[in-house]
Each structure stands twice: as C-alpha cells, then as structure tokens.
C-alpha cells in the first residue's frame, strides 16, 4: 500500500492493513533541521521559483519517509514577475520592483525563539470589547472563487508537489479552531477573561473566526488537499460548560464543511482531555489526535482507543522528547509496537503519530528510524 492508501484506509470503517507513519507540524521539523534535511540555502523557502522550491521539498520528503505532506501556498504569477531574492555579503533581501521595497530576510531560529531568546506571545495593548471592533479585526472574506488561486498561480507549487507525490502521499493543510483563533485577538489573559465574563462577545468572535476557517478549508480543497489538521490550544483550561457552548458548535460546523468538500478532518486537541472526552468526540471529526502525557496529565493511547471505541480514527501520541529524542532504539520499537497494537483494537482505524512536534535535538536519522519502524511493525 502507498502512504496515501494507508491513511485513506485508516479513515475508513474497515481500517487499514498497514499502519501509516506521520509526524505532526512538519514545518517546525523542517525549520529546526534545515541543514540536515537539504543542501539548499536557508532562504530558498522564500524564492519565487517553483523548481527551486521543489528541489528542497524533494530532499525533505526523501529523508523523512512519512506518509503525508503539507501543501504550501505560493506567490502569484504577478508576484513572481516582480519579486526577487538577492543574496548579498551583508545579508539576504527580498526586493519588489513594483514598489521599490526591499526587505531583509532573517534566517529562522531553531526552536522558533526571537532574536532575544524570548517566547513570542500575544499581548494586545487594547482589547476588542465590542462586536464592531471584532468585525474590524476579523473581516468576513469575499465570496469564494474556487478558480482564482489556480488562475493567478498561487496553487502552482501545490500542484507541482501533487503531480510528483500526490498518488502515494496524503496531502494535508492546517487550520485553527475558531475559539483558538481568539488568542490572536485577545492574547491569553484577555481570551480567558472574555470567556469568563463576556461569553456572548466570544461567541461573536468565534462566528467571525469560523468564516476564516471555512475559507481556508475551501482553498485547501481547491488546491488538492485530502485532509485538514484542525489545531486547538488552551481550551483544556476552560470549563466543560464553556467548552460545550463556545467551542464544540463551531468546530462541528468546521468539520461539516470539511466533510462536505470531500476531505477528512483531524482534530488535534492540545492539553488534558479530562472532563471533555464526549464533547471532543461529538464534533464528528474523522480522527482525533492528542498530546503525549506531560505537564501533569496522562494520555495513554490504550485509554484513548477504549474511549473512542471505533467511532473515529485515532492518531498515536508517541512521546517526542523522552522516546523519540532520548529513548533507546529498543524503547522506541517497544512503544511503537504497543501503540500499533492499541490501534488495531480501534479496528485498525489508526495512524501512528507523535504527541508533539519533533524537537530540535532529535536527529533526522532518528525521525527516519521512527517512520521505518512504524512501517515494519505496522504491516500485517
């Protein structure tokens, strides 16, 4: 079976004969392991040239060995006519001849830290406190034109990757859940305060955010994606009642849109699912993905499978730090075998994955070993 066939089978009621191997957030993995993964210079993800982009994508796909890949966006044809990347002794610059603007590109930092080594978090100086302010910050997109990005060339890189890999790897894109998007509106403290004191305003923000999520899903379908990864963070910190009213209905509608377009949905819920299991399953996603045990909570894949009981596919949650990065090969093999066995008890509706992104300290060879072991141990 190809990787795509394995994943498609894992979503089916019959399950898959061969367990697929994936990592979550391959963009983080690529950023943190660029020099190990490709011979291309660090600025090539910015170049307005499809073949140069394809060159580093080919190297990454060949070295990683997983069964899916993320479909990127790209410059329009007009942008490609006007934008150049210039590597100079003093740095790398992006020039736009339409405006004369010159932007210095900064090499991405391992771990995603700022130049000062700080974590980047959102702390707005003023909070949006009215529906009008929210509407101004989250404008509703114009009517969707499914052919626009194809005609203007923004899908060209995605189409090139699909021509080369789409028959045997499963193409995905990422969206955020509507409530999680509220973090970008209010920051952590503001989001939590609004959920507690202004739930009607939060619901309005979620309604607006849902339009952005639906548009992202429509664009993903138009460029050839087969699956959507729905990311959600911080919602383990709110009550089950707030979760039921401010999160579940909006994620359910996002899932329904994904299904209506013929795509599969993967709901990645970050944090402790205690007290919210049935709500998580009630959104109707095609698959559920959870973190590994950490931060004081326990998520055992065997317990996940018992709770899901075949109602949807389950993604594995291999520990990205203690096992993938630091464990022995024997420990890694044993945990993959244990999780695969648990997945078989979910009717083989199972995709082996990690609970969190690959860490900067994990080698490329180790990630390839993980994928190879899954393919070995996941074969019937």
Where is each model-derived feature located?
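Bulky hydrophobic/aromatic packing residues
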Residues: 62-69, 97-103, 108-109, 136-137, ...
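Generic hydrophobic, aliphatic-rich segments that mediate packing or membrane embedding
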Residues: 53-57, 88, 154-157
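Active-site loop segments of alpha/beta catalytic cores
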Residues: 1-35, 42-43, 124-380
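Segments that shape or occlude catalytic/ligand-binding pockets
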Residues: 32, 36-79
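Compositionally biased, intrinsically disordered low-complexity regions
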Residues: 5, 23, 29, 75, ...
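Short active-site-adjacent helix-start/loop capping segments
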Residues: 29-32, 69-71, 77-87, 103, ...
């Amino acid at each position: 079976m190809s990787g795509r066939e394995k994943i498609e089978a894992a979503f089916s009621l019959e399950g898959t004969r061969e367990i697929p191997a994936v990592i979550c957030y391959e963009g983080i993995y690529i950023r943190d392991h660029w020099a190990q993964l490709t011979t291309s210079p660090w600025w090539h993800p910015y170049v307005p040239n499809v073949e140069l982009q394809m060159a580093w994508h080919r190297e990454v796909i060949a070295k990683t060995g997983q069964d899916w890949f993320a479909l990127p966006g790209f410059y329009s044809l007009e942008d490609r006519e006007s934008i150049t990347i210039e590597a100079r002794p003093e740095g790398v610059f992006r020039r736009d001849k339409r405006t004369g603007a010159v932007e210095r590109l900064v090499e991405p930092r391992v771990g995603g830290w700022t130049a000062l080594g700080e974590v980047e978090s959102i702390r707005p100086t003023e909070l949006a406190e009215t529906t009008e302010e929210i509407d101004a910050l989250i404008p509703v997109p114009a009517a969707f034109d499914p052919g626009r990005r194809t005609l203007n060339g923004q899908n060209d890189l995605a189409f090139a990757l699909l021509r080369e890999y789409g028959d045997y790897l499963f193409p995905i894109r990422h969206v955020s859940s509507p409530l999680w998007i509220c973090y970008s509106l209010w920051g952590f403290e503001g989001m939590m305060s609004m959920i507690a004191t202004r739930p009607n305003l939060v619901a309005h923000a979620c309604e607006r955010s849902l339009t952005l999520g639906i548009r992202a899903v429509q664009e993903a379908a138009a460029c050839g994606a087969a699956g959507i990864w729905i990311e959600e963070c911080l919602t383990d910190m709110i009550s089950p009642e707030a979760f039921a009213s401010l999160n579940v209905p909006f994620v359910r509608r996002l899932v329904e849109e994904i299904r209506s377009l013929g795509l599969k949905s993967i709901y990645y819920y970050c944090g402790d699912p205690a007290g919210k299991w049935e709500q998580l399953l009630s959104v109707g996603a095609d698959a559920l993905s959870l973190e590994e045990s950490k931060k004081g909570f326990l998520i055992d894949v065997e317990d996940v499978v018992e709770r899901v009981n075949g109602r949807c596919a389950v993604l594995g949650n291999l520990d990205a730090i203690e096992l993938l990065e630091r464990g022995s090969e024997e420990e890694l093999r044993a945990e993959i075998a244990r999780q695969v066995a648990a997945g078989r008890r979910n009717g083989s509706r199972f995709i082996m994955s990690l609970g969190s992104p690959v860490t900067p300290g994990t080698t490329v060879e180790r990630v390839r070993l993980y994928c190879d072991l899954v393919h070995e141990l996941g074969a019937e």
